[in-house]
UniProtKB/Swiss-Prot annotation:
Keyword Nucleotide-binding: yes
InterPro entries found in the cross-reference section: Adenylosuccin_syn_GTP-bd, Adenylosuccin_syn_Lys_AS, Adenylosuccinate_synth_dom1, Adenylosuccinate_synth_dom2, Adenylosuccinate_synth_dom3, Adenylosuccinate_synthetase, P-loop_NTPase
Binding site for GTP: 12-18, 40-42, 304, 330-332, 412-414
UniProt record similarity statement: Belongs to the adenylosuccinate synthetase family.
GO CC terms in record: cytoplasm
Protein name: Adenylosuccinate synthetase
PANTHER family per the UniProt record, alphabetical: ADENYLOSUCCINATE SYNTHETASE (PTHR11846:SF0)
Cofactors named for this entry: Mg(2+)
Keyword set includes RNA-binding: no
GO terms, molecular function: adenylosuccinate synthase activity; GTP binding; magnesium ion binding
A Pfam family it matches: Adenylsucc_synt
Length: 428
């Protein structure tokens, strides 16, 4: 009954897609449990690269069942674009299962997301504009539309009417926009529902039955710990729970069925959008990391903010998620540096903090306290065991492990699928 949770331990873009694909060859199901198509990730198989936003990374593997859980907000138009794109390249998506209880991102959610960000001006959150936040807001306000609502015209019309009642008032009176037509929106959603229906299932039942039968389920988180709406750098966060606890609420599987929690961390740190970032590099070092690591968003194309490894963040992620293992990615990007700084603590108003401040004002004021490790020049992409790595590279990894408080069980040494060193098994 192995239930394995895979989450990001930083601010996202850690390489979870590659880690999922690595583990996915040994599991029976891969289930996404949070977020929406704001979560871009790339999977490289041989010479082929697949950019995914909504589909689980495991969709590439024909021998497992990919699942979109109830905690995900689903934009049907984006889902069909991804399915069509993969099938045009010979990838069969017919085995996909979508939770009947997942909430839908409707066209008006995207509209609201964009106009709200413009209205907020300098106070904007820095969303992707894809309707994620408004869809989750509707879920909490109990006016959301779920997948199973798309199959009954009268019921759906009532749901759309209820959802748009307040939104149209806001659009007209606050944002000076035209109201959204209820009938037209209902018709659009009904058509989307017709195509979605073959994929729809009671995914909670499917996953629990699989675990009871001794099959292995990988729970794939989108975004990351520091973007969690409860545990991240609020308010500069996503609208869901990308932490390990979200795997349970986002799929309908109980916590006693989770046997392992794996966090993915880059060998440095990146962030997209607004919000505090203590180790951010605004100089040529940051630009060097950005270019060497190809740090541009899969979803938005935006350049990512780059900084040195933050051990305080990783310790916090280990604590919040109960990490059992860390997958360290993009270690190869650091090749060529003479010295590599590691943030081991923060200076907040002259006082040392070894742990994450809960006060976001304090976190925004935090200055990194660094220790420096020697770098290496050797190409590590052909290394297949930890002992083959340069001695200074090994020392860097061991220090990150010590500071994070969790063992590093796999290391990414390059962009290809086989550019990885496995130290400990990730699947029991």
């Amino acid at each position: 009954m192995p239930g394995i949770v895979l989450i990001g331990a930083q601010w996202g873009d850690e390489g979870k897609g590659k880690a999922t694909d690595l583990i996915g060859t040994k599991v029976d199901y891969v289930a996404r449990f949070n977020g929406g198509n704001n979560a871009g990730h790339s999977v490289v198989v041989g010479d082929e690269s697949y950019a995914l936003h909504l589909l689980p990374s495991g969709i590439i593997n024909p021998n497992l069942t990919p699942v979109i859980g109830n905690g995900v907000v689903v934009d049907p138009e984006v889902l069909f674009e991804e399915i069509d794109g993969l099938e045009s390249r010979g990838i069969d998506c017919s085995h996909l299962k979508v939770s009947e209880a997942a909430h839908i991102i409707a066209p008006y959610h995207r509209t609201l997301d964009k106009v709200t960000e413009r209205f907020l001006g300098k106070h904007k959150i820095g969303t992707t504009g894809r309707g994620i936040g408004p869809a989750y807001a509707d879920k909490i306000n109990r006016v959301g539309i779920r997948v199973h609502d798309l199959f009954n015209a009268d019921h759906l019309h009532d749901k759309v009417e209820a959802s748009l009642h307040q939104k149209n008032q806001m659009l007209v009176k606050l944002y000076n926009r035209r109201p959204i037509d209820v009938d037209q929106t209902t018709e659009e959603l009904l058509k989307l529902g017709e195509r979605l229906k073959p994929y729809v299932a009671n995914t909670g039942l499917i996953l629990n039955k699989a675990l009871d039968e001794g099959k292995t389920v990988l729970f794939e988180g989108a975004q990351a710990t520091m973007l969690d709406v409860d545990h991240g750098t609020y308010p500069f966060v996503t609208s869901s729970n990308p932490t390990a606890g979200g795997a349970c609420t986002g799929t309908g599987v109980g916590p006693t069925k989770i046997t392992r929690v794996i966090g993915v961390s880059k060998a440095y740190v990146t962030r997209v959008g607004e919000g505090p970032f203590p180790t951010e590099l605004l100089d040529e070092s940051g630009e060097w990391l950005r270019q060497q690591g190809h740090e541009f968003g899969v979803t938005t194309g935006r350049p990512r903010r780059c900084g040195w490894f933050d051990a305080v963040v990783n310790r916090y992620a280990s604590q919040v998620n109960g990490l059992t293992d860390i997958v360290l990615t993009k270690l190869d990007v650091l090749t060529g540096l003479k010295e590599i700084p590691i943030c081991v603590a923060y200076d907040v108003d002259g006082e040392r903090h070894d742990d994450m401040p809960t006060d976001q004002a304090a976190f925004a004021a935090a200055k990194p306290i660094y220790e420096t490790m020697p770098g290496w020049d050797e190409d590590i992409s052909d290394c297949h065991s930890f002992d083959e790595l340069p001695a200074t590279c090994q020392a860097y990894v061991k220090r990150l492990e010590e500071l994070s408080g969790c063992r590093i069980s796999a290391i990414g040494t390059g962009p290809q699928r086989d550019h990885v060193i496995q130290i400990n098994s990730l699947v029991d």
